[in-house]
Amino acid sequence: MARRKKGDAISGWICLDKPYDLTSTSAVSRVRRAFNAQKAGHAGTLDPLATGVLPLALGEATKTVPFLMDADKAYRFTIAWGRSTTTLDREGETTDSSDVRPTREQVEAVLAPFIGEIDQIPPNYSAIKVDGERAYDLAREGVEFELKTRKVKVHALRVTAAPDVDHLELEMECGKGTYVRAIVRDLAAALGACGHVDQLRRTRVGRFTEQTAIGLETLENLSYEARLSEALLPVETALDDIPALAVTDEDAFRLAQGRAIVLLPRQVESLKAVLTPGDRTVSAMSGQRLVALCEMRAGSLNPVRVFQLT
């Protein structure tokens, strides 16, 4: 006899405004407790010292996490000039110092090479694995290692304010795997200066934005008032860029059983018109209910992820 899962069968997304000095794992645990959810996860780690958008998946929404991991992101951050650190942020130990204080104009003059597809070496204090171990664990233990250069995409990088000679505020829009701390490290080097990230806030992950994010305390207060449903977003929120196809009740039943369905010629043509080249992923919907994520092959839809939603 199968063991009954602990918690409630709640499914959906939470757009959390993660507070300062809280790990992403701890944020997941607190939200899971608030909802008494059977299962929870997050779509992309946010450093403890960073604040902002942390999309959290509950229940069946965890099946859609991989689709959000590839989404574009946006950040707002502050550079503090004068000191380089081990962690590339204000919490690290000083590795170098300088009296150089780049002006706004000087920074803007060197931004162009940091926009587009660029080569970036991730910070040693990162979650990247090295021979099966997290880089940040090796760094804390004093183990010497080198991370490989990776290709990342920066869609936009702009200076937004220069509050004083020691600080500069910027905004960045980028693809997955781009590290703000590495951008600041390399920007300071290009200017012959020392600098680190003083403040960091993620403002967007895909369609999840800071304007719709909810604070952790607010969420926990809703839990006490039995109003958590007000903060819960549909499972398909993370699938905004994936074409949707309405299916009949009969086809929905077949897909739920893991069986393929045959598409009408007009359905094939309509999907081809919206699918990007090389992409065959389609979400099958029965009314407002997500039935399955499917792959379109030879005029049929083959279920890849089936959702148990009511």
From Swiss-Prot:
Reactions catalysed: uridine(55) in tRNA = pseudouridine(55) in tRNA
Active site: 47
Keyword presence, Magnesium: no
Source taxon at top rank: Bacteria
Pfam family, one: TruB_N
Keyword terms: Isomerase, tRNA processing
Transmembrane regions listed in the UniProt entry: none
InterPro entries xrefs: PsdUridine_synth_cat_dom_sf, PsdUridine_synth_N, tRNA_psdUridine_synth_TruB, TruB_C
GO biological process, one term: tRNA pseudouridine synthesis
EC number: 5.4.99.25
Molecular function GO terms recorded: RNA binding; tRNA pseudouridine(55) synthase activity
Similarity remark: Belongs to the pseudouridine synthase TruB family. Type 1 subfamily.
PANTHER family hit by this protein: PSEUDOURIDYLATE SYNTHASE TRUB1, TRNA-PSEUDOURIDINE SYNTHASE
Function comment: Responsible for synthesis of pseudouridine from uracil-55 in the psi GC loop of transfer RNAs.
Protein name as annotated: tRNA pseudouridine synthase B
